Amino acid sequence: MVKQELKIQVTTSSSSLSHSSSSSSSSTSALRHQSCKNKIKKYKGVRMRSWGSWVTEIRAPNQKTRIWLGSYSTAEAAARAYDAALLCLKGPKANLNFPNITTTSPFLMNIDEKTLLSPKSIQKVAAQAANSSSDHFTPPSDENDHDHDDGLDHHPSASSSAASSPPDDDHHNDDDGDLVSLMESFVDYNEHVSLMDPSLYEFGHNEIFFTNGDPFDYSPQLHSSEATMDDFYDDVDIPLWSFS
């Protein structure tokens, strides 16, 4: 009888230890997951989808609908898209993720309150900003810019010097030229693009995440023919910075 009671006590004790160890392991795993989640840098207007992509949208001024800005592989790219759209809508006083974006984009440097942009144009500007190299969002070196300008201004006939420029510089100049060329295409830009469902919850410019309702049941891609911006807008250009 004594041996049987001892055996029962030992078995119960082992079961308790196993349960305690399992609970401790689960708790540690949960804490580690939460810690990793907290380390992810948060950007205004950007949210991470469950499968890892980053999405962003922005509300059109004086409207309940939102302009879909795209789905991107990194949070930084989505944040650049949001910044470009917000800057188009609110001007230099906008609270941006990357404040120096205005010094690296020729187009964004030249817009003013008299500029008229359609939602489709804003989408295109956002996509260009998102796909730009991250180097574009680092303040340029004054010394390097001075040397580069001297080479172009004082030696315009030195084609061999231009041909020997590093490939990265050529790529940088091409991207800047693409942004500037957008100005000519805004008025006649009729390419089909996707837009978020206008019945979504409210989403303010200064919120870090979208509403907890997770309205993104799909990931529409730019240049899709299934839905057009005309379904939600009357193709009326938006006067910049004319709202609070």
Curated annotation (Swiss-Prot):
The keyword DNA-binding applies. GO terms for cellular component: nucleus. It is found in: Nucleus. Residues 1-33, 123-178 are annotated as: Disordered. It comes from the Eukaryota. Pfam families: AP2. Residues 11-29, 157-166 have a biased composition (Low complexity). Residues 143-156 have a biased composition (Basic and acidic residues). SUPFAM superfamilies: DNA-binding domain. GO terms for biological process: ethylene-activated signaling pathway. Its main location: nucleus. Keywords: Activator, DNA-binding, Ethylene signaling pathway, Nucleus, Transcription, Transcription regulation. InterPro entries: AP2/ERF_dom, AP2/ERF_dom_sf, AP2/ERF_TF_ERF_subfamily, DNA-bd_dom_sf. Residues 42-99 bind DNA. One of its GO terms (molecular function) is transcription cis-regulatory region binding. Signal peptide: none annotated. PANTHER family: ETHYLENE-RESPONSIVE TRANSCRIPTION FACTOR ERF013, ETHYLENE-RESPONSIVE TRANSCRIPTION FACTOR ERF042-RELATED. Probably acts as a transcriptional activator. Binds to the GCC-box pathogenesis-related promoter element. May be involved in the regulation of gene expression by stress factors and by components of stress signal transduction pathways. Belongs to the AP2/ERF transcription factor family. ERF subfamily. This is Ethylene-responsive transcription factor ERF013. The gene is ERF013.
